Amino acid sequence: MKTKTLKLKFYTDPGHGWLAVKRVLVDQYMVSEPVTGYSYMNGKTVYLEEDYDAPRFLEAVKGAGYIVEIEHRNSPHKDSPIRRYEHFN
């Protein structure tokens, strides 16, 4: 069986962090428990909040056989623009 790799970006600002995931993957792997309103969306990307939604997504994709590689992007001195995106619904 060929190993599947999923490359994701994790964005942080001084107060919080979000894992950027394509909406199609969220819909596929987070079926049993819906995403909370603490996550955001912009276009076809969902920004899963770090405390609850992101860990559940990572657990689901790892359980499906993916190896996950995460690139960290940090905004240490100002709020991330993600905070202005639409809340997930």
Where on the chain are the PLM-derived regions?
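Sparse, context-dependent recognition of short Cys/His-centered cofactor- or disulfide-binding micro-motifs
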Residues: 4-6, 42, 70
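N-terminal acidic leader/helix
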Residues: 4-36
